[in-house]
């Protein structure tokens, strides 16, 4: 049978992974619509990072072009369990189900197999949807203190843990800035990992030291952009809303995404050229 002609093993896992991803992101979108309204939320892509649709596209592009592979009995059993976790009215269940599903795909497929590639992206998704939140819950103080230390290096302000002391400023009602979990670089790092994994698997690039180094450089770039964003708030606290919530925040987010995409993309292009040569 031709590629993508029948519902095969890759299609099953692409469907399950996408279902879990949609269930995990839906509450975020619904909350943003309730907060901003449908029109404004839509313009803001419902507060969902573009790396998630990129990951979904990569998963389905990989599955669509895959040779037919029969679904195993254990695949159906795993699929049934995942499906139950996806539909139960517990928000965290859909996110948590990505962990065993991705682990199962990685464990039951060879490294060059389509199912392994989908599982690789699924594992990357768990970083943003599962492990990032757990890490912040368990190690919030040291993680946020690292962000604060980077900002201190850029601005020279006094720092106490995750608290930046900016002093009294004319027209500003606060003299301290607290870095919370939503402002942590960890969130951006997890999204860069998703972008890296999606592009690497979509273009079938071998995970070499050079490709990993490009991913680490992309992570460093997004950490720097996040630190610059917070540093701008320190320098111009009177423009907090613009920098932290408004167009300024969106523009800096775009800069971080473009930088990461450029770094990862150039690495993939070099790898493909070397493979052809």
Where are these predicted regions, by residue range?
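Hydrophobic N-terminal alpha-helices or hydrophobic patches in metabolic proteins across all domains
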Residues: 1-277
